[in-house]
Structures are given as structure tokens and as C-alpha cells.
Amino acid sequence: MKRLIVGISGASGAIYGVRLLQVLRDVTDIETHLVMSQAARQTLSLETDFSLREVQALADVTHDARDIAASISSGSFQTLGMVILPCSIKTLSGIVHSYTDGLLTRAADVVLKERRPLVLCVRETPLHLGHLRLMTQAAEIGAVIMPPVPAFYHRPQSLDDVINQTVNRVLDQFAITLPEDLFARWQGA
């Protein structure tokens, strides 16, 4: 069983993280480990009709963001890596500065030190120079910066289509193949 850590921070776009967990429920060889910041819990209730319990039930394992002794806080606990979807600027800053005041940033720090993939789906706009510098620093220490920017070549017809394309592309970063892609991949013109 392969393990993937799914972090959800307080940035707008909680539905992306929810959809990722929904999709991974059907991938039998992936065990999901969910950690949500306190702000994510608030954003979830503001932006979606999902309850915290419903989202937690989508994950195989749920960790309290305050539990610094959780399995995912150690490099000896093997994972494929971690995605934070969405990733707030606060969380990005904590990761860049190794300020591991909770499990979300601690798990990300561990993934980086173990040289495993860390995908940060930074959700903020517009960006000022400080934000851009943080993203540059994160990339320099090994993170993949992957803002949830929609593509239009597959001609999305709904918000779900936009979300699905981002989720599928995130899974590509971990070489997780779905039985059927969630969007039409570019085949050339």
C-alpha cells in the first residue's frame, strides 16, 4: 500500500482537496493521510456543503493538525510524498522557513528533508513580491509549485471540469494513474 499525505490549508479552494480525496477513494493501492489546518475547517464550511466529518471520512487516515507526534511527522514513515491543496500563503511561509508549529508544516518539512515530492497548490491572487519570493524559495528547497490554474484546451463545461483537471494533474506529479482520466489530455493540434 502506497501512502499519500493530503494537506488542506485555509486558502480558498477547499473543494480541490475534497475532490482529490473523493477521487483517491477509488484508487485501491493508495492510502490517504489527511491533515487540515484550523483555517481549512472554517473555509470548508464557508465554501462547500461538506461537513468536516464527511471530508474526514473520505480519507483512510485523518490526523489532528496539532498532533506533532503523528506518524506523518517522521521521515521513517514512508510515503509517496505530500500535496497541500489548496496551500495558503501562511502555510507556504511556514514551510519555506521550516516553522513547523503544527502537523501540516511539520509533515511538509519531513517530506522535503526526505527528498520526497511536495506539491504546493498555492491559491492566492494577486501575488506581491513577497509571495513570489516564498514560492521561489520553496522551489529551491525542492517543492513543486502548482497553483490550481485552469486549462481550457479540454473545453471545460463546468466548474467540476476545471477542478477535475487540476486534481488529475496533481496526481500526475506522484505518478498515480487513474483507471480513466478526469479530463481530455492534450493530444496535439
UniProtKB/Swiss-Prot annotation:
Disrupted-gene phenotype: Cells lacking this gene produce very low levels of coenzyme Q(8) during logarithmic growth, grow slowly on succinate as the sole carbon source, accumulate 4-hydroxy-3-octaprenyl-benzoate, and have reduced UbiG O-methyltransferase activity. In contrast, they synthesize near normal levels of Q(8) in the stationary phase.
Source domain of life: Bacteria
InterPro entries xref list: Flavin_trans-like (IPR036551), Flavoprotein (IPR003382), UbiX-like (IPR004507)
Keyword Flavoprotein listed: yes
EC number(s) reported in the record: 2.5.1.129
Example of a GO MF term: carboxy-lyase activity
Top EC class of this enzyme: transferase
Binding sites annotated in the UniProt record for dimethylallyl phosphate: Y153, R169
GO biological process, one term: prenyl-FMNH2 biosynthetic process
SUPFAM superfamilies tied to this protein: Homo-oligomeric flavin-containing Cys decarboxylases, HFCD (SSF52507)
UniProt induction comment: During aerobic growth, expression depends on the carbon source, with the highest expression on succinate, a median expression on glycerol, and the lowest on glucose. During anaerobic growth, glucose does not inhibit expression.
Alphabetical keyword list: Flavoprotein, FMN, Prenyltransferase, Transferase
Binding-site list for FMN: G10, A11, S12, S37, S88, I89, K90, T91, R123
Record-linked Pfam families: Flavoprotein
Catalytic activity: dimethylallyl phosphate + FMNH2 = prenylated FMNH2 + phosphate
Function comment: Flavin prenyltransferase that catalyzes the synthesis of the prenylated FMN cofactor (prenyl-FMN) for 4-hydroxy-3-polyprenylbenzoic acid decarboxylase UbiD. The prenyltransferase is metal-independent and links a dimethylallyl moiety from dimethylallyl monophosphate (DMAP) to the flavin N5 and C6 atoms of FMN. Acts in concert with UbiD to perform the decarboxylation of 4-hydroxy-3-octaprenyl-benzoate, a step in the biosynthesis of coenzyme Q.
Family listed: Belongs to the UbiX/PAD1 family.
Name under which the protein is recorded: Flavin prenyltransferase UbiX
Name of the gene this protein is made from: ubiX
